[in-house]
């Protein structure tokens, strides 16, 4: 605990896949200052995605300064800083100079597909699943880190000499903001690395040996809500959670059976399972989340690789919309998609398929298909993929969700939210506070330093802005969904690969 009597604000840093943001909250969890900066995406080869870690730090630092200036407050009035981040994205840097040895390898990047295939051939898949709760997929940090050590000249030798450090983005930012004094991560981020035992809550020696990772590179793993250190300007760094776990906490889904979907670049559906690490038989991940006080809890997660990025593709590559916000208007102009299905498997398929060799496709094209139908099919694909995951999740947990809480940029799209409720047959609740990912990090930081007293105080701040109720009948719903399943099957195993 720290003395927060004269400090009236919490800063949340929300380091995402395409932008860095800073959001300042007051004691009533109102937003009083924000700033956002986009940064460059690098695609050196097909299926590869990289970021510049120094640009991430620079944009994140700038947004903090800008948000404080916008709010008209000083560092001295800030009780604590919480960080939430794009997960799995992997940074390796020099301990002395603080310079990365390679670009950050982003969660979307598929370059370690062959490393994963070799792990499977060597018979490690079951152990990885049992120990980490994850599937053997290029999505997670461990094989990205192995790729850097294997492919960057001198990296492995330097890592073994203790000269290099590894971190996910939270770790990298805290190391930079603390002036190189603090090398930590939290349980939620560690659980996404493919190197962490989610049952013993330790780095797993056998997995480190399998991947060839020197243990001394790894950060210390700590709870999501505690004071880890201070920035150079003296602000307590007091909360960390991976973006999806942070959103789950920000939505107050802290009890078993509560679930949310975040619609961002990808879509992420998490269900809190309390102290039970539920094993999925449907290709979902078992991961670590935050309990009522930020302590370790478990969750089931389904990840959809391409959600909002599908709309970005319509805008930036096909150029059939000028602004993502316009998609609601165009989709609503037509009564249905005219039989068109868009499967956005640009980087393979995530849960529950886990097919890195699938590729995107448009199905059902006829001469009567207009641009509006394709735009509508793109939005519908986000809802269909969410249903894929939610169906699997409900079967694993043996219970039916009465409602789904939603957040992320795309929830502003009323067409998408209504179609989501229709295709699920479940109410969709959209909160008044849209910044739930940042809010979760702020809550974790505020609880750690005594800024907020506890969960009851936070629950009072959660207001539902609009509820979308299902309007499709069962026959229509299932006919549409059957068409989607048929389309997905046609995209599977498209890329050539070794067996």
Swiss-Prot record:
Sn-glycerol 3-phosphate binds at residues 17, 87-88, 139, 243. GO terms for biological process: glycerol catabolic process; glycerol metabolic process; glycerol-3-phosphate metabolic process. The keyword Transferase applies. One of its GO terms (cellular component) is cytosol. Pathway: Polyol metabolism; glycerol degradation via glycerol kinase pathway; sn-glycerol 3-phosphate from glycerol: step 1/1. GO terms for molecular function: ATP binding; glycerol kinase activity. Its EC number is 2.7.1.30. Glycerol binds at residues 87-88, 139, 243-244. The keyword ATP-binding applies. InterPro entries: ATPase_NBD, Carb_kinase_FGGY, Carb_kinase_FGGY_CS, FGGY_C, FGGY_N, Glycerol_kin. Keywords: ATP-binding, Glycerol metabolism, Kinase, Nucleotide-binding, Transferase. It catalyses: glycerol + ATP = sn-glycerol 3-phosphate + ADP + H(+). ADP binds at residues 17, 21, 265, 308, 409, 413. ATP binds at residues 17-19, 265, 308, 312, 409. Inhibited by fructose 1,6-bisphosphate (FBP). Belongs to the FGGY kinase family. Key enzyme in the regulation of glycerol uptake and metabolism. Catalyzes the phosphorylation of glycerol to yield sn-glycerol 3-phosphate. This is Glycerol kinase. It comes from Pseudomonas putida (strain GB-1). The gene is glpK.
């Amino acid at each position: 605990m720290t003395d927060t009597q004269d400090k009236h604000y919490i800063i949340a840093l929300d380091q995402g896949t395409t932008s860095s943001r800073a959001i300042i909250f007051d004691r009533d969890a109102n937003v009083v200052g924000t700033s956002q900066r986009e940064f460059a995406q690098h695609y050196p080869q097909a299926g590869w995605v990289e970021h510049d870690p120094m640009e991430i730090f620079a944009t994140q630092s700038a947004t903090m300064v800008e948000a404080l200036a916008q709010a008209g407050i000083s560092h001295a009035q800030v009780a604590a800083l919480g960080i939430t981040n794009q997960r799995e994205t992997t940074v390796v840097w020099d301990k002395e100079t603080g310079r990365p040895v390679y670009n950050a390898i982003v969660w979307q990047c598929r370059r370690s597909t062959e490393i994963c295939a070799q792990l499977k051939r060597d018979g490690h898949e079951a152990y990885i699943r049992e120990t980490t709760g994850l599937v053997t997929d290029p999505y997670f940090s461990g094989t990205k880190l192995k790729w850097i050590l294997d492919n960057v000249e001198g990296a492995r030798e330097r890592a073994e000499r203790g000269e290099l450090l590894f971190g996910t983005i939270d770790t990298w930012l805290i190391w930079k903001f603390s002036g190189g004094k603090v090398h930590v991560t939290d349980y939620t981020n560690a659980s996404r690395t493919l190197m962490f035992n989610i049952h013993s809550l330790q780095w797993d020696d056998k997995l480190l040996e399998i991947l060839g990772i020197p243990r001394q590179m790894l950060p210390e793993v700590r709870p999501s809500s505690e004071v880890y250190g201070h920035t150079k300007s003296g602000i307590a760094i007091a909360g960390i959670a991976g973006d999806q776990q942070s959103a789950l906490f920000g939505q107050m889904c802290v009890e078993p059976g509560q679930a949310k979907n975040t619609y961002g670049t990808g879509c992420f559906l998490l269900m809190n399972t309390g102290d039970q690490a539920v094993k999925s038989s449907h290709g979902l991940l078992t991961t670590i989340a935050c309990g009522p006080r930020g302590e370790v809890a478990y969750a089931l997660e389904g990840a959809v690789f391409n959600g909002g990025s599908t709309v970005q593709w319509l805008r930036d590559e096909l150029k059939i919309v000028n602004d993502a916000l316009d998609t609601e208007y165009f989709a609503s102009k037509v009564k249905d998609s005219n039989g068109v299905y868009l499967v956005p498997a640009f980087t393979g398929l995530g849960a529950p398929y886990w097919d890195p060799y699938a590729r995107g496709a448009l199905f059902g094209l006829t001469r009567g298909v207009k641009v509006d139908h394709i735009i509508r099919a793109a939005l519908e694909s986000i809802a269909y993929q969410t249903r894929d995951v939610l169906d699997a999740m409900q079967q694993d947990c043996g219970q039916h969700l009465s409602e789904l809480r939603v957040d992320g940029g795309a929830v502003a799209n009323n067409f998408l939210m209504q179609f989501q409720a229709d295709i699920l047959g479940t109410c969709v609740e959209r909160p008044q506070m849209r910044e739930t990912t940042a809010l979760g990090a702020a809550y974790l930081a505020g609880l750690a330093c005594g800024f907020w007293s506890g969960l009851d105080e936070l629950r009072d701040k959660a207001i539902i802005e609009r509820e979308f109720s299902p309007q499709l009948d069962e026959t229509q719903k299932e006919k549409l969904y059957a068409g989607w399943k048929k389309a997905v099957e046609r995209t599977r195993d498209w890329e050539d690969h070794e067996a």
